[in-house]
């Protein structure tokens, strides 16, 4: 009898700090077999030389772990003359000249291949001064990037990031409809969708056919409008409604824990893993 297909639980080692072994060892302890690589050794993974990426891959291999995704910072950028606000890109420059961008795309895809990651996250240009904000739809670099990715056996997934130009459902659907046939999918951050007021059942059902990866983090809203991050399932993001809808559309999605909890990230990851295992229908591998 064939075993039923299940969704996958993923952990990002840099949630515990720059030493990737700490997060990898926690993944093993929690029974998590897949990793998301974003940064390591204090540097963005896309900027690391081949030998350091190979070392990270060997650390994962030694523990029986596979790299499910490279959480790259591609397109979380603007022109050099623009002035972005404070943006967390994990050591990657936010101001990137047009002539350097394809090189970064190619470098990220090579990094994914070295790590054994089948998926690479991208963004959609930072929102800066109106006259300098670039449009993602129609960006000539995107078809080039999709072609390079397809040749390399890697899939590009667009994250809905509020500081970027494509975060709401309408532009997301426009971009995905236009480029889905070329391989583009959705890296859905449910908390980001909730932040822009659109983590509803109707919106999730529209987006679900395009989803290839799910980011899971949670937060509590404070009276002053700020947010306090907390373990998944303990905040205001409506996972109890959203996760069953995503599972119904695709029963084998990867769910990646991204806590942003600074005081006790290991405890938050432990609690988040337990929450997802009890909430995603069909269980998690």
Language-model features, listed with the residues they occupy:
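Short, contiguous alpha-helical
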Residues: 14
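Conserved beta-strand positions in the central sheet of alpha/beta enzyme cores
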Residues: 36, 69-71, 121, 157, ...
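Histidine-acidic metal/acid-base catalytic patches
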Residues: 2-9, 17-33, 57-64, 78-79, ...
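Glycine-rich, proline-tolerant flexible connector loops at the mouths of alpha/beta enzymes
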Residues: 37-60, 125-130
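Alpha-helix-loop-beta-strand connector modules within alpha/beta enzyme cores
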Residues: 53-70, 139-149, 239-242
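Active-site acidic/histidine proton-transfer and metal-coordination neighborhood
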Residues: 19-21, 25-29, 62, 78-186, ...
